[in-house]
Amino acid sequence: MERMDIIIWLLAVVIVLTTLMIFLHLKTLKIIRLLFPVSKELSKKSCVFPWKKKWTKNYPPSSMYP
């Protein structure tokens, strides 16, 4: 019974945190960026989304609309 109570409490905490992140997503993103500067560097290098560069290189908008 104690384990179930802990699981329910953890789920409630997770739900509260997710709702706070949804409502204050801009502020939380700023905090996350401050806490994790590595993620900012990765996003600058576009290592997280490498297909964006490939798509723009191989298929420019001018070739898509002749």
Swiss-Prot record:
Topological relation to the membrane, as annotated: Single-pass membrane protein
Family: Belongs to the ATPase protein 8 family.
Protein name as annotated: ATP synthase F(0) complex subunit 8
Subunit structure: Component of the ATP synthase complex composed at least of ATP5F1A/subunit alpha, ATP5F1B/subunit beta, ATP5MC1/subunit c (homooctomer), MT-ATP6/subunit a, MT-ATP8/subunit 8, ATP5ME/subunit e, ATP5MF/subunit f, ATP5MG/subunit g, ATP5MK/subunit k, ATP5MJ/subunit j, ATP5F1C/subunit gamma, ATP5F1D/subunit delta, ATP5F1E/subunit epsilon, ATP5PF/subunit F6, ATP5PB/subunit b, ATP5PD/subunit d, ATP5PO/subunit OSCP.
Function noted in UniProt: Subunit 8, of the mitochondrial membrane ATP synthase complex (F(1)F(0) ATP synthase or Complex V) that produces ATP from ADP in the presence of a proton gradient across the membrane which is generated by electron transport complexes of the respiratory chain. ATP synthase complex consist of a soluble F(1) head domain - the catalytic core - and a membrane F(1) domain - the membrane proton channel. These two domains are linked by a central stalk rotating inside the F(1) region and a stationary peripheral stalk.
One of the GO BP terms on file: proton transmembrane transport
Keyword presence, Ribosomal protein: no
Native source organism of the sequence: Mammuthus primigenius
N6-acetyllysine, modified sites: K54, K57
